[in-house]
UniProtKB/Swiss-Prot annotation:
EC category name: isomerase
Toprim domain span: 456-570
Family: Belongs to the type II topoisomerase GyrB family.
InterPro entries the record matches: DNA_gyrase_B_C (IPR002288), GyrB (IPR011557), HATPase_C_sf (IPR036890), Ribosomal_Su5_D2-typ_SF (IPR020568), Ribsml_uS5_D2-typ_fold_subgr (IPR014721), Topo_IIA (IPR001241), Topo_IIA-like_dom_sf (IPR013760), Topo_IIA_B (IPR000565)
Listed name of the protein: DNA gyrase subunit B
Quaternary organization: Heterotetramer, composed of two GyrA and two GyrB chains. In the heterotetramer, GyrA contains the active site tyrosine that forms a transient covalent intermediate with the DNA, while GyrB binds cofactors catalyzes ATP hydrolysis.
Keywords carried by this UniProt record: ATP-binding, Cytoplasm, DNA-binding, Isomerase, Magnesium, Metal-binding, Nucleotide-binding, Topoisomerase
Gene symbol of the encoding locus: gyrB
Amino acid sequence: MAAQRKAQDEYGAASITILEGLEAVRKRPGMYVGSTGERGLHHLIWEVVDNSVDEAMAGYATQVDVRLFDDGSVEVADNGRGIPVAVHATGVPTVDVVMTQLHAGGKFGGKDSGYNVSGGLHGVGVSVVNALSTRVEVDIKRDGYEWSQFYDKAVPGILKQGEATEATGTTIRFWADPDIFETTKYDFGTVARRIQEVAFLNKGLTINLVDERVKQDEVVDDVVSDTAEAPVAMTVEEKSTESSAPHKVRHRTFHYPGGLVDFVKHINRTKTPIQQSIIDFDGKGAGHEVEVAMQWNGGYSESVHTFANTINTHEGGTHEEGFRSALTSVVNKYAKDKKLLKDKDPNLTGDDIREGLAAVISVKVSEPQFEGQTKTKLGNTEVKSFVQRVCNEQLIHWFEANPVDAKAVVNKAISSAQARIAARKARELVRRKSATDLGGLPGKLADCRSTDPRSSELYVVEGDSAGGSAKSGRDSMFQAILPLRGKIINVEKARIDRVLKNTEVQAIITALGTGIHDEFDISRLRYHKIVLMADADVDGQHISTLLLTLLFRFMRPLIEHGYVFLAQPPLYKLKWQRMDPEFAYSDSERDGLLETGLKLGKKINKEDGIQRYKGLGEMDAKELWETTMDPSVRVLRQVTLDDAAAADELFSILMGEDVDARRSFITRNAKDVRFLDV
């Protein structure tokens, strides 16, 4: 990819196939970009960037530039071949076909198209971006000239030929339509994380991200690092300077010569590896390619991330199945052959072997089959056997060639197996339970009367006193209450046997009914709303983070499917004389309600006019219902998982052993400690 290929004739007007127009896109944007909220808005950037990355994957581009402007527009530029400008068979310039016809793109022409591999089926990309924008400008360098075109609500102008040039490439700038999207404000952190991921997956590709919206004197959190190396140990003076220094986000350059090796370094940068080298290999087949990088660390959680044609396959798929099968088989055979396991000993399980494993599996498939509309699970059956064969051959070679590291890996897996066996009694308490079977539920659970999971809610509440108020104030038809006594165990620092001996963890897993890890079965979930309700202070936030860490590490699909929420209890109660009280959820809202009320002639109680809630236990049942539990007025924040790798790193920093990394993160993000969106 690093060496640019000059073969524009391979990607010309004849490579473009038209399937249908854009009429339906503006009517049903959610079908094409997922939503009209923030996620859908950012999807516009992904579609344009993916097209530039396709040029890089095909070997024609080495650099992509992404720029966020003050006027809400986004510009994506690459130095690829440039979108064709020749007249298409339909009689219009090919660039107009690409920009105005749904599914029109070189990637739909099979072996005769401009691409052998592309990012899934996002050939709908630029045309959908055009359909959902008020204006799009396209500048092309191709065929010896500069070309420019614009689109007003997807209607093309006249293609203009400019000055002569020997350069090639495409620049697309678009303005998302505010009448379609709920917001047109892009989040730098979201964009940076996705672009960093793309750079990791495309070894040697340079991606520049510039945020023109940041003023020179504005202090912004450094939300992403563009280095894959582990942090260098700092002196006390350096730590002090680093903690107090403002982090300005204006320009980030992502360039990883090591590709997936750098990705694994990045994942493990706050952890302690148990082997010196990173395992790195690749393989090619008929219409398939696979690349793998992996390294074990001293932690207890696995961090395996899979991609197909640079698309993050959150739900895994056949490529992950092939990798897992090969790894489990190779490690068990090696352990038996080297007498690290006795012949009579049971085999190590996949969970045992993957404990502490950081791995990235990236496949390129000429004709990918993604299950569902979201493209998060690869379905190509032939990919499993291909990946399994490559991984089997390469892992056998690595284990034989690295006996010291191999022994450390096997011993860690054996230690994990011993912990698993020791936890067997505890695990029996958290076996999967039927969605309607109430047997064996924890005694402190106040269950709801409904047996329909779709309408049932579970409030996990901090403290018995708050749990009592919640039980009294709830609607017992559909709301269940599970009170917790104090802080649960930090699963980031404990092995599964210790985790499953914790009574609070037992109660949570048993109440949910799904089981954990490989036993997890989402169809057995007893509640489709799991609401974490803790005090609105630092201790409450810590408890919420502990609970989220448990769910992320042991029952991640609950988050992926959108079943987990954070309750938003009020911070203040304003008591007016001879009038109903009002509740404020922040300092600014308190000040606003007070100012408005006084202007309207209201009088605040003199002695206890403004009450600050120190905890949920200070609210009676009626207040808790009216402010935090009544579906008609409550505010719930849904916990989402857009980037598993970023979330994995975040939980490792917040709940892991690296104190310096945690201090640095908290210092940079101190201004927004109210809520951390995972």
